[in-house]
Amino acid sequence: MSMKKENTLDYSKITATLMETFNYKSVMQVPKVEKVVINMGVGDAIFNVKVLDDVVEELKLLSGQSPVITKAKKAISNFKLREGMPIGAKVTLRGARKEAFLCKLTRLVFPRVRDFRGISGKSFDGRGNYALGLKEQIVFPEINIDKVKKIRGMDIIIVTTAKNNTQAKKLLELYGMPFKN
């Protein structure tokens, strides 16, 4: 008898269910989650670059790897933004870190979100990718509320190999994503 870790999913069941649902001929046709991108944009970084240090540290805590600082692609004078200014940070998770993050998201983070009734089923891009936003970073168990200087939101993009939204939605449902009806 083998002991199974609490934070893992049974991919053979997910694959079997998807093959049965969509009548795939080969296992290679079954959609998979390719990567998860976590992005935190910080508008305050225009005036105070030190704010980015907090964001980088928080992303490092919740993802387990070092984030990349994102820079402005073009200048916008109304926001006093110049091209190349640091305005946020992002992390791309693949492999075991991606799986652990998705598991943590569905089992720990969503239950801690205030007034949570499920995630929207309309946030697919038409090509099987899903985007969602969280309003506060303190819902993650790694973030210490006492050390947070300002509550910030984040974007989480789940990139799949699915060809359309229905395949991607079924895949994410099998991963444990709680969609609204």
UniProtKB/Swiss-Prot annotation:
It comes from the Bacteria. One of its GO terms (molecular function) is structural constituent of ribosome. GO terms for biological process: translation. Keywords: Ribonucleoprotein, Ribosomal protein, RNA-binding, rRNA-binding, tRNA-binding. GO terms for cellular component: ribonucleoprotein complex; ribosome. Belongs to the universal ribosomal protein uL5 family. This is one of the proteins that bind and probably mediate the attachment of the 5S RNA into the large ribosomal subunit, where it forms part of the central protuberance. In the 70S ribosome it contacts protein S13 of the 30S subunit (bridge B1b), connecting the 2 subunits; this bridge is implicated in subunit movement. Contacts the P site tRNA; the 5S rRNA and some of its associated proteins might help stabilize positioning of ribosome-bound tRNAs. Part of the 50S ribosomal subunit; part of the 5S rRNA/L5/L18/L25 subcomplex. Contacts the 5S rRNA and the P site tRNA. Forms a bridge to the 30S subunit in the 70S ribosome. This is Large ribosomal subunit protein uL5. It comes from Onion yellows phytoplasma (strain OY-M). The gene is rplE.
